[in-house]
């Protein structure tokens, strides 16, 4: 059985996602998107009434993928304590590695303010944010993780994973290595997990020694 060819609308979204990820909203031309898709610019407006509408669809589609993955991850067992925290961090790290377009879109939106207002994006993200913070608070009450500011910890975790990848060129220059090599990615993931394990798990040993220190 042959796979159905993607619709014109789907093709527009794929091309637009890459363009917006590479150049941001302001630096992206609808004419360039239409040209790459292979349609005339006016035809694009049959599918999306404006550049803002197209950008909004691209951004919300990207975050829908993120929400679906987090829902699946947080529903897995065991759904408590450090094992759940570790699973969420590993899943987030893998998603960001596999979806560099998402990383760049998120950074462009944060930098530009974007035509999707920050308030709207915050409204979309809030249920997942509150779910994560609520989980941590429940685990603190049960004594399975150390007491901390759960809401700020969720933001810190998101930033720790996202920033390493969004700032990869700078990170590479500072560390003197390719930050996206398999070894570097594994090292960074374990480093982040080590820090959060030390911060959250009662009685956990301190972070491991720095490379080259015995």
Give short role names for the model-derived ranges:
Residues 8-11, 15, 19-53, 57:
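Helix-turn-helix
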Residues 91-94, 98, 126-142, 146, ...:
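C-terminal peripheral helix-coil segments that are non-catalytic and often amphipathic
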Residues 60-65:
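Short, basic, alpha-helical segments at the C-terminal edge of helix-turn-helix-like DNA-binding modules
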Residues 57, 71-104, 142, 150-157, ...:
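Hydrophobic alpha-helical connector segments
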Residues 97-119, 168-176:
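Amphipathic alpha-helical segments used for helix-helix packing
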Residues 107-137:
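A contiguous binding-surface segment within folded domains or other stable secondary-structure elements
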Residues 1-7, 11, 18, 39, ...:
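N-terminal intrinsically disordered/low-complexity leader segments
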């Amino acid at each position: 059985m042959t796979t159905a060819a993607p619709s014109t609308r789907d093709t527009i979204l794929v091309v637009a996602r890459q363009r917006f990820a590479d150049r941001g909203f302001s630096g992206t031309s609808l004419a360039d998107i239409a040209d790459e898709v292979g349609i005339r610019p006016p035809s694009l407006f049959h599918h999306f009434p404006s550049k803002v509408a197209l950008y909004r669809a691209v951004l919300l589609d990207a975050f829908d993928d993120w929400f679906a993955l987090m829902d699946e991850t947080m529903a897995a067992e065991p759904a408590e304590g450090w094992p759940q925290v570790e699973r969420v961090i590993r899943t987030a790290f893998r998603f960001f590695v596999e979806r560099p377009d998402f990383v760049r879109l998120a950074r462009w939106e944060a930098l530009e303010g974007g035509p999707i207002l920050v308030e709207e994006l915050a409204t979309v993200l809030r249920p997942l944010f509150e779910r994560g913070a609520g989980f941590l608070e429940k685990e603190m009450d049960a004594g399975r993780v150390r007491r901390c500011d759960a809401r700020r910890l969720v933001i810190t975790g998101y930033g720790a994973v996202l920033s390493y990848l969004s700032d990869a060129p700078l990170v590479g220059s500072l560390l003197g290595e390719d930050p996206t090599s398999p070894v570097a990615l594994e090292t960074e993931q374990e480093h982040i997990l080590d820090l959060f394990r030390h911060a959250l798990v009662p009685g956990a040993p301190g972070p491991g020694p720095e490379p080259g220190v015995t």
